[in-house]
Amino acid sequence: MFDADVKVVTPRLTLRPFGPADAPRVRSIVESGARFLPPGAPTHVAGVPRWLEAGVHELRDSGQGVHLAMADAEGRIVGAIGLFKTSWGAGTTEVGYGVHPLHRNRGFATEAVRGLTEWVFATTDLRRVDLTANLDNLASLRVAQKAGFTWEGVLREASLEDDGPHDLVVFGLLRRDGRAPAEILPAAELRTERLLLRPLSEEDVPGLTATGADALTQAMTGVPRGYSEADARAFVALREQMRIRGDGVAWAAVELDGGRFAANVDLRDLDWRDGSAEVGYMTAPWARGNGYAGEAVLGIARWLFQVRRFQRLVLRAAVANPASQRVAEKAGFVREGVARGALRGEDLVVYSLVPSDLP
């Protein structure tokens, strides 16, 4: 059983049990309709005193966990965090949290998760902490990554919400693990002579949809057939999930003059040990022939080599797509060979770029 007087202090927060003195704050939270308090929290103010007296402590009394308030330096309850599903015999527990809507995007969740997991390993014999998050909850995925957890897998449709089933990502942190976050590429904003390369986002869905549905894109790339707005939205979410896993990052290339969507460019298949990656892109139909794709690829390559210290960048283009091959060659890529049947049975020309190739 966890101690009744758990107290974890982080640089900006104090994690401590809820108590009767929290009644005014909790009543205000309940009245506001904010949903971040632990499971079983009252939905009407009349239930607040009883919940603070007993309900919120039932988990600790069961021996399976503990609910804690996240209090800031002024004593405001900015969130809640807890341990649950604790198996003392197996040495495992799970952490869950919620942050008040008015205090989100300030790093409180990551700070609290890091603080509580450090406390677990320092004061108990537990050896593993789990964290689960819906696959489409990008904010929670980022919290887990920043808190040093390892992405271990996806449980399909394991979470049931009001809008239906959701896939659930399982993260784990072991006592012996390092606490530094896994390496990922930042969602950096880059500029070239004519383009702004910014992280791919929902605002790029119309441009992505038109580009992905274009006949030439359909013929020369591996995008889904009959590309739709739903495919574009899924692509945006998938690319951010890949970034959080350390597998890649994606940009929208837009004109500096006017902001029109010109291309999507992404890095994928990152090998952190050897410092290699692959680049891919789709050019908007209206932007073809203007050199935008090559300009964007070269700008990203410079950043990847000079700032991130990678050593090799691969680009593959369909044998039947001479325009894409010209993009690679104008950007300084060197042709290495042909990967037979690599894209739906079609051959791909393999190019590579290393730092010494940069023009």
Regions found by a protein language model. Give the residues of each.
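Acyl-donor (CoA/ACP) binding surface of acyl/acetyltransferases
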Residues: M1-F36, H67-M220, A250-P359
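Short, P/G- and charge-enriched loop/turn segments at secondary-structure junctions
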Residues: F2, A54-E58, E183-P186, L238-E240
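A ubiquitous structural signal for well-ordered alpha-helices
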Residues: I29, W51, G55, L116, ...
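Conserved GNAT-fold acetyl-CoA-binding loop/helix
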Residues: A34-A54, L68, L216-L238, V249-W251
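Short loop/turn motifs at secondary-structure junctions and domain boundaries
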Residues: E58-G63, F149, Q241-G246
